[in-house]
């Protein structure tokens, strides 16, 4: 079984298209866990309408009592998941046709428990912007420090290889990048499928849209989370900055 985890917060304009991109994957044994983080718009109503019109889709809406933020929403989804494979998709991003089939076959071929794919930037209307981010066949911890090319909405874990208790998003800024660093430090192998299989929708609410904030977050990860020395932090940061610009040119 594949468990797809989708954190939701005020995504009434986007969540239907995201769900369409999941249900059109054609995976028979799949559950979709939508974790709403106290949305103040009509996201919950839109989701409930979608579930009612797609009764056999395996979609389940989880509404926790308190506010969790993206990290907590994903962690709750992980705890609730029943599948061998855990996939992530943000509630405003989209998967390409057959994304799951291609990636699962790739993971089986490579014997890999942690995989990610290429992706393309899209505008707020989900129109592709023609900029595809290529990914390496494998990525090490040292390489990830300089080029955080792993995009959350492309990631799948095989929990028979990567321990479920190791898949925990920390409650810090850039929690996804922090998790990739943690797993790579522990020796898990991350494999990249260099196919454009996801659309990364750039909305006004994108947490990572502010370049200065992104730079500040990655620097704080180096120094406070990874405890890198100052020289290694500077070296990694220069590489990160170069690659971040290149991804957007």
Per-region residue spans from a language model:
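Short loop->beta transition adjacent to catalytic acidic/histidine clusters or analogous donor-positioning motifs
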Residues: 1-2, 23-34, 42, 56-60
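Glycine-rich, basic loop-to-helix element that forms the pyrophosphate-binding segment
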Residues: 64-81, 102
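Acidic helix N-cap motif at the loop->helix transition within catalytic regions
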Residues: 14-16, 41-50, 94, 98
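Conserved nucleotide-sugar donor-binding catalytic segment
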Residues: 6, 79, 135-213, 217
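Conserved donor NDP-sugar-binding/catalytic core segment of glycosyltransferases
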Residues: 98-129
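Short aromatic/hydrophobic "clamp" motif used to bind/position activated sugar donors
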Residues: 86
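Short, well-formed alpha-helical segments that are part of the catalytic scaffolds
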Residues: 11-24
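A conserved acidic beta->alpha catalytic loop
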Residues: 21, 36-45, 66, 90
């Amino acid at each position: 079984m594949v468990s797809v985890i989708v954190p939701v917060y005020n995504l009434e304009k986007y969540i239907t298209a995201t769900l369409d991109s999941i249900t059109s994957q054609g995976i028979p044994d799949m559950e979709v866990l939508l974790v709403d983080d106290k949305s103040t718009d009509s996201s919950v109503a839109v989701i409930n309408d979608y579930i009612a019109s797609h009764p056999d889709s395996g979609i389940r809406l989880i509404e926790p009592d308190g506010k969790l933020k993206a990290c907590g929403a994903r962690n709750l989804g992980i705890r609730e998941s029943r599948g061998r494979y855990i996939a992530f998709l943000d509630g405003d991003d989209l998967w390409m046709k057959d994304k799951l089939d291609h990636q699962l076959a790739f993971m089986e071929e490579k014997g890999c428990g942690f995989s990610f794919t290429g992706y393309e930037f899209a505008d707020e209307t989900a129109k592709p912007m023609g900029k595809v981010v290529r990914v390496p066949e494998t990525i090490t911890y040292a390489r990830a420090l300089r080029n955080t090319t792993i995009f959350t909405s492309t990631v799948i874990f095989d929990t028979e290889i990567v321990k479920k208790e190791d898949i925990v998003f920390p409650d810090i800024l850039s929690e996804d990048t922090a998790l990739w660093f943690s797993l790579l430090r522990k020796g898990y192998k991350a494999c990249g499928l260099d196919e454009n299989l996801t659309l990364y929708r750039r909305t006004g609410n994108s947490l990572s849209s502010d370049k200065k904030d992104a730079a500040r977050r990655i620097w704080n990860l180096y120094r406070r989370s990874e405890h890198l020395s100052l020289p290694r932090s500077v070296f990694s940061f220069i590489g990160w900055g170069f690659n971040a610009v290149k991804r957007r040119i």
